[in-house]
Amino acid sequence: MEAPAITRRRRPFLAPIWLPALLGVIAVVLAVLAYRSVTTTTVVLVRHAEKALSTIDDPPLSPEGEQRSERLAQIFGEREGAGHLDAIYVTNTRRTQQTAAPLAARLRLVPVVLSGVDVAGTAARLLSEHRGGTLLIIGHSNTLPQLVRELSGKDIKPIAENDYSDIYVLSVPRLGGASVLRMKY
């Protein structure tokens, strides 16, 4: 008597199950990657609040500047929900740090001190680190126009020495053109 031949039996009924599941997983991964690539980053830029009239190199805020910094905290002070700030950036000057202080305390954020003169590099780094987030940059009349240009590709008019009331809101999508909204506070 001859031994029966061993044959491998295929299970064709499993292919219709695992193949669509695999394709579904691939589709989800691609959708997540596509979403991350088109996510919009919101950058809010303001000039530091009014500084005290002083002969020192790094003057503190004036009483008007302290009031303005409190208004900034009221405007952006929500910790949750749409439009909340993920990070606050300041320069190494007392007036930018004092402008940020009430808002940072309310949000329980530690302001990050921007260093250096490489505006283009700083802009690229901030967009990369905060893709899809919302961040606030408190700067100076001579640096904010450069930052707006580097972040959005758009030019804004020079900021007057006595103008402390502008808020620039930049919407910077991963793909496509950025928009700049200018408001007063």
Model-derived regions: residue spans:
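Conserved alpha/beta-hydrolase "nucleophile elbow" surrounding the catalytic nucleophile
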Residues: 140
